[in-house]
A protein has these predicted regions:
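Soluble N-terminal domains of membrane-associated systems
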Residues: 1-85
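Interfacial/capping segments of alpha-helical transmembrane domains
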Residues: 63, 119-145, 190
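Membrane-interface helix starts
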Residues: 78, 95-107
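Cytosolic juxtamembrane amphipathic/interface segments immediately preceding
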Residues: 83-100, 149-150, 154, 158, ...
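Interfacial loop/helix-cap signal at membrane boundaries in integral membrane proteins
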Residues: 89, 130-173, 196, 204-206, ...
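Small-polar-interrupted transmembrane alpha-helices in polytopic inner-membrane proteins
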Residues: 112-117, 185-208
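Hydrophobic alpha-helical transmembrane segments and adjacent short intramembrane/lumenal linkers
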Residues: 197-288, 292, 297-299
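Short, highly charged, low-complexity non-transmembrane loops/tails of multi-pass membrane proteins
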Residues: 316-335
Length: 335
């Protein structure tokens, strides 16, 4: 395509569309119809230029023109309760379900790493000595020690809010940093598993493994699952850069990135639940079996939510991405 000839042939249409968009007064019916027609044609022109003769300056101008025209034609779309319901019932669980081949292996391998670290620390006193002095370790692991009082030393509401904020930020980092080929995600995962392994090893070496499990399992099952989902999705996003499949790398990254943003919101809600459990249930006076039961029920409910609702939505074609009309990266074309 001869770009100069193309621009000469259609410049008048683009200028006319720009003029209509700049009108201060309300458009007449005929002008509104003209605006819609020019919007469709300009969107088609933009698509042609992007595919056959990309020119950064011209593409930028037409992209802005099409965006302004789209806003004028469709109006600014506001999120509704229907959108929220659709996201929670279809979009988010489907996105988690679609990523299961990444986060389930991530969860299994990470748990294995934490268990091995815990065994290594618990059976090697010389390793424990590098963590803290013997007196400090005794203070940490004794009945009523720092490990137990950590969950009850602050008001439940403020502690739950702090935990939720920290965990939501960690999950968001896993999703965001996935674009760096997943390497930062692996480091975040290792840090989390190391912390878990240290607690496991020290408490088991002190003969208090039952106390450790009673403190970690109520909130930890759901919390760690959310972290594993975020990490697995981040790794998937990183792999998309390496192997985008049948899609172009740009389109694949845009689609997976938008889905990841939605997952960050959904996982923040999941972590809110685990944070509430950690703040109010874990330090409560409930029997250990009751606290663990609450954690198991919350975990099973989340898995059912993902595999039942999410699986059904995914099989129906839901991906967790935005609707086509809402994708800023998509360019409408004339029918």
């Amino acid at each position: 395509m001869d770009l100069d000839v193309f621009v000469t042939a259609h410049r008048a249409e683009w200028d006319r569309l720009d003029a209509l968009l700049g009108r201060q007064r309300r458009l007449t019916g005929a002008e509104a119809d003209e605006l819609v027609a020019l919007y469709q044609r300009t969107a088609t022109h933009l698509s042609l230029i992007q595919s056959s003769a990309p020119d950064p300056q011209l593409t930028g101008r037409l992209s802005q023109l099409v965006a302004r025209a789209r806003s004028a034609v469709t109006g600014t779309r506001r999120a509704s309760w229907r959108d929220v319901t659709r996201f929670l019932a279809h979009g988010f669980p489907a996105a988690v379900y679609r990523s299961r081949h990444w986060w389930v292996p991530t969860a299994l391998l990470s748990t294995l790493v934490a268990a091995l670290l815990g065994w290594w620390i618990g059976t090697h006193p010389e390793v424990q000595a590098t963590i803290a002095a013997p007196s400090e370790l005794r203070e940490l692991t004794r009945p009523g020690g720092q490990y137990e009082t950590y969950y009850s030393s602050h008001p439940a509401a403020s502690f739950a809010a702090q935990v939720w904020t920290n965990n939501a930020w960690a999950a968001a980092l896993c999703l965001i940093l996935g674009v760096f080929l997943g390497l930062p995600v692996l480091w975040i995962l290792f840090q989390n598993m190391l912390n878990l392994g240290v607690g496991f090893g020290l408490m088991s070496s002190a003969g208090r493994l039952d106390t450790f499990l009673g403190l970690v399992l109520p909130h930890g099952l759901l919390e760690l699952t959310a972290v594993f989902v975020a990490a697995g999705t981040g790794l998937r996003l990183g792999w998309t850069l390496i192997d985008p499949g049948p899609r172009t790398r740009r389109i694949a990254l845009a689609e997976e990135g938008r889905a990841a943003i939605g997952m960050a919101i959904g996982l923040a809600l999941v972590l809110f639940v685990s944070g509430a459990i950690e703040g109010f249930v874990t330090p409560s006076g409930l029997p250990t079996w009751a606290r663990i039961t609450i954690g198991v029920v919350a975990e099973l409910a989340f898995l059912a939510y993902v595999y039942v609702l999410g699986g059904r939505a995914a099989r129906a074609g839901e991906t967790g991405d935005l609707d086509a009309a809402e994708r800023s990266a998509a360019v409408p074309t004339a029918a």
